[in-house]
């Protein structure tokens, strides 16, 4: 074959290469992909991971992501609930039903058992709460079961202490967190190195917001406890919050219960979790409500975060979630 002369080569039409268009992920797809990568990374890297599951919206979404990460196989690690004994019945019913559906092992770490064993002392008085006592119960359960990685549903938009915490949060032999001694996380590279007795807290939802959670609930049809939607309940006002009338709370002088239409933005110990007045009965209603809100759910409804300006960070340093 005769060689192509230079002037002939210049006259040849340019070759047009066509490549298929890259699929553009929605922001929810991108968040889901990141979280599933983190969950799979932990399952591959650690010997005994566990996922905290309280039945709240964040842990419900996190468990759905774990389900997707390993489908069609089962979730390969247990879930754990640190049970204060002061729970909302609707949340416990949901927790048990969801665990049964997935066929995963449920580890219940009981604060009451810690009290009975003398590990912690229960607070007294009308403002008493078991919220802070959970730290000892959690750390004891981690030690008892030799868990080396603990998934949590914390998000950075919730509270300023969580905003500066890494996805992989190193905890020392005592379960303590030192915010000044955190490991760098470049792109999707995570350092899970630890010694025996130490463990890593892992937060796959770090980059999600409350609105992202609710949009994902709508998009993926995630079931949640009924108290996340508007319902009539007896409540009373304390320190600007609406607390549910409960056998775990002693009313103070001047506090009068009344029935109101409310819902809960976050779920925790009944003694310190407030409700908000709301008529949002559907996921779409809640999304519209959250989109218009300018206060995070913890800032608006959690009495335990109002103890001091550094209330959450102080608890996390001790080993809290």
Per-segment meaning from a language model:
Residues 13-321:
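Nucleotide-activated chemistry modules centered on ATP-dependent adenylation/adenylyltransferase
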């Amino acid at each position: 074959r005769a060689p192509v002369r230079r002037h002939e080569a210049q006259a040849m039409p340019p070759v047009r290469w066509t490549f298929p268009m890259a699929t553009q992920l929605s922001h929810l797809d991108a968040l889901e992909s990141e979280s599933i990568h983190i969950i799979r990374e932990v399952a591959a890297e650690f010997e005994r991971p566990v996922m905290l599951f309280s039945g709240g919206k964040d842990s419900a979404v996190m468990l759905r992501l774990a389900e997707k990460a390993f489908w069609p196989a089962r979730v390969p690690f247990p879930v754990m609930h640190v049970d204060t004994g002061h729970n909302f019945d609707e949340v416990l019913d949901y927790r048990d039903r969801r665990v049964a559906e997935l066929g995963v092992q449920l580890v219940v770490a009981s604060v009451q058992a810690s009290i009975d064993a003398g590990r912690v002392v229960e607070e007294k008085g009308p403002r008493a709460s078991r919220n802070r006592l959970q730290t000892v119960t959690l750390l004891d359960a981690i030690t008892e079961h030799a868990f080396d990685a603990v998934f949590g549903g914390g998000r950075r938009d919730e509270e300023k202490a969580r905003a500066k915490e890494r996805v992989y949060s190193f905890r020392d032999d005592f379960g303590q967190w030192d915010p000044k001694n955190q490991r760098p996380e470049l792109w999707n590279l995570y350092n899970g190195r630890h010694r025996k007795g130490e463990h890593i807290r892992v937060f796959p939802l770090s980059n999600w917001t409350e609105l992202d959670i609710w949009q994902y609930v709508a998009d993926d049809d995630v079931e949640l406890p009924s108290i996340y939607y508007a319902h009539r309940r007896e409540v009373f006002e304390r320190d600007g919050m609406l607390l549910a009338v409960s056998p775990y709370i002693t009313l103070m002088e001047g506090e009068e219960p009344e029935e109101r239409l409310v819902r809960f933005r976050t779920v925790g110990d009944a003694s310190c979790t407030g409700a908000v007045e709301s008529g949002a009965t559907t996921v779409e209603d809640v999304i519209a409500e959250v989109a218009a809100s300018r206060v995070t759910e913890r800032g608006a409804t959690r009495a335990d975060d109002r103890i001091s300006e550094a209330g959450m960070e102080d608890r996390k340093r001790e080993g809290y979630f």
